[in-house]
Amino acid sequence: MSGDNSSSLTPGFFILNGVPGLEATHIWISLPFCFMYIIAVVGNCGLICLISHEEALHRPMYYFLALLSFTDVTLCTTMVPNMLCIFWFNLKEIDFNACLAQMFFVHMLTGMESGVLMLMALDRYVAICYPLRYATILTNPVIAKAGLATFLRNVMLIIPFTLLTKRLPYCRGNFIPHTYCDHMSVAKVSCGNFKVNAIYGLMVALLIGVFDICCISVSYTMILQAVMSLSSADARHKAFSTCTSHMCSIVITYVAAFFTFFTHRFVGHNIPNHIHIIVANLYLLLPPTMNPIVYGVKTKQIQEGVIKFLLGDKVSFTYDK
């Protein structure tokens, strides 16, 4: 087997084949992915710079947005440059340990994105249900601790992915029909029993997804009750409009995630493998691409921040929570 050493069934490297069955069209497939990646990097880095530069945006909501942007740009950067090397230069080899590292960061950052969306829902809950205590509840230390706790949660849950994958013997070859090192795609290359990998992967996906979605659902239930109790229609519209960008991000992220998750596990045999691979890439690229667009279009404070950033002190705005 290519990549074997004499004393172990662990390969020295894997071969990422890209999109199986569509090798002849790799160049054309790469174009929309490259375009989306550029938008994601420019948009999210722009948001981070804007929030760090504009003192008026130094509020909990925008700190969480900056954390989401950092997570998004890091997530797509872990897989898109390598994918483009496969598509453009036919550089398909990836070192075994590099593959495990990519696997860890892809899954950890995916969980991190879900966790940050959950924190943003809690932020909106505090802002709308406890507006007078908003600044005293969500202080900078609290925000930092919440972000750190979310990060550590995902690190601790995803580390076993690499350990479980590393223990498997690889005697069937080292060719992976994918554009990046996904946990189960790598495990299925092995000639060992990867049932533990499958069970643990399902458990982690459900644990992170169910917990975060429950927190988001409870937060928005309380928000809806608080908004509906307001006497003024204008006040209800103003309060709920602060949540629209976040709700759009939730829909984009979780619809893509659940589509990938359920089609892969329950109707996978009825869907061609190349469709799975393309959807898996879109699942990782679509939220980072769309989030800065959604927040730029839907959030008045971001629009005003961009204008002020470009024009300097010539204009001034009043920012709400």
From Swiss-Prot:
This is Olfactory receptor 52N2. The keyword Transferase does not apply. Residues 1-27, 78-101, 163-198, 261-276 are extracellular. Residues 49-56, 123-141, 220-239, 298-321 are cytoplasmic. It is a multi-pass membrane protein. It comes from Homo sapiens (Human). InterPro entries: GPCR_Rhodpsn, GPCR_Rhodpsn_7TM, Olfact_rcpt, OR51/52/56-like. Odorant receptor. GO terms for cellular component: plasma membrane. Belongs to the G-protein coupled receptor 1 family. The lineage of its organism: Eukaryota, Metazoa, Chordata, Craniata, Vertebrata. It comes from the Eukaryota. GO terms for molecular function: G protein-coupled receptor activity; olfactory receptor activity. The keyword Cell membrane applies. Pfam families: 7tm_4 (PF13853).
